Amino acid sequence: MIIITGIPGSGKTTLVKRLVQDLGVRGVAQDAVKEFLADHLGGTYTDQQSSALGRVTRRAVLELGIEFEKLGEQIIIESALQTSAAEEILQHSPHRPILQIYVTCGLAEVKRRFYARKQSGHRHSVHTDDLYDKLTEHEIRDKYRPLVADNITTVIVDSENLDYAALRDTVKDFLMNKAITEENEI
């Protein structure tokens, strides 16, 4: 399984779409699942309800990845995983290698992207998008820090200075069961 994580607005969704297209592997983005569920459940969402649906969605996306793993299939999961909850879920997964691509970006650029997305009029109404108004940078980076487990190899990428070809090749090697044995920065 490949998990693309990072703080909201860091460029995860853009990256997963590109990797899925270029590598021909399955992929699922947390926001797409959350929006699908919100459309089918209907109604408007308070901050608390949106957060609750987000927790369920993150869990569902990880469980989907685990099920694909059990079937011997590869999938790329994209989510702004809240680290402590995700690590607990992954403890129950088959102990197969996981490649984590942790996407980072300067805070000024993350906020610019985040607020542009919020103000674009194209953002689904289920997203309350007040994260950067409520928490400090330290709290956000701690909440969405990289996952740590014996079977997780982490590659850290800066979406403002991304060597996409190198990252794509790393993901391709992982998919072909080639060992990626140390933490890397690309």
Where do the protein language model's features map onto the residues?
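C-terminal accessory "lid"/substrate-recognition subdomains
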Residues: 172-186
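Conserved glycine(s) of the Walker
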Residues: 11
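Small-molecule kinase domains that catalyze NTP-dependent phosphoryl transfer to phosphate-bearing small molecules
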Residues: 119-168
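The conserved Walker
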Residues: 8
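Conserved phosphate-donor/acceptor-positioning beta-strand/loop module used by diverse small-molecule
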Residues: 94-115
